[in-house]
């Protein structure tokens, strides 16, 4: 039986060309039953993800695959995620923070979270939704609205919607994984001075 996947790509009217080409390859491969849902101009991020959650539950697909519009997963990325047969799994998506690239896959440490640098398939506490596959059982167990911004007590900062969703999923007993061999392109603007400083520090 073909895997059935509801692909959700929230966007602001643009997706990467590389992502469009990968979607075309998946659609024409005949390997999957796919639906692509691309809600535009819904902000903030947690609202867009909750819309995707709601629309997914109206359909009969087994999996929801979130892809960020500025990401470029490899063509074999979907097969890799499916092959793990776990409830929540994503690839490695890097972001730039404090002058260094870090994976958006984290483990809890004390009262906060720290990036986790793993190998192969490893369990984490939080993973970005930039390229993440979620089984229907998770999305049926969690109410629509489970993606939410979590404010810090003093209101000066907060946790993004992925943190809150992952916390709620773990509270329901679901495990979260990152495939550290699945590298996903992520287009980000950054200050090249920071790159230069990082190279000097590392050299």
Description of each model-found segment:
Residues 21-25, 51, 80, 164:
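Alpha-helical elements of Rossmann-like donor-binding domains used by nucleotide-donor carbohydrate transfer enzymes
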Residues 1, 145-203:
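C-terminal catalytic/acceptor-binding lobe
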Residues 1-43, 47:
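N-proximal low-complexity "stem/linker" segments adjacent to membrane-targeting elements
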Residues 53, 74-151:
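Conserved catalytic core of nucleotide-sugar-dependent glycosyltransferases
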């Amino acid at each position: 039986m073909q895997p059935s996947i509801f692909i959700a790509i929230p966007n602001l009217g643009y997706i990467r060309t590389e992502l469009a080409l990968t979607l075309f390859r998946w659609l024409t491969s005949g390997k999957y039953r796919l639906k692509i849902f691309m809600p535009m101009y819904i902000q903030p991020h947690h609202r867009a993800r909750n819309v995707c959650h709601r629309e997914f539950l109206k359909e009969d697909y087994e999996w929801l695959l979130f892809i960020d519009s500025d990401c470029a997963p490899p063509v074999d990325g979907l097969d890799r995620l499916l092959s793990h047969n776990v409830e929540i799994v994503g690839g490695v998506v890097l972001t730039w923070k404090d002058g260094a690239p870090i994976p958006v896959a984290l483990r809890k440490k004390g009262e906060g979270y720290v990036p986790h640098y793993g190998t192969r398939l490893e369990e984490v506490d939080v993973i970005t939704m930039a390229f993440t596959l979620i089984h229907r059982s998770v999305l049926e167990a969690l109410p629509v609205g489970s993606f939410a911004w979590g404010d810090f007590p003093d209101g000066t900062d907060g946790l993004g919607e992925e943190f809150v969703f992952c916390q709620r999923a773990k509270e329901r007993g679901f495990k979260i994984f990152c495939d550290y061999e699945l590298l996903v392109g992520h287009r980000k603007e950054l200050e090249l001075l920071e790159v230069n400083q990082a190279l000097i520090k590392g050299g």
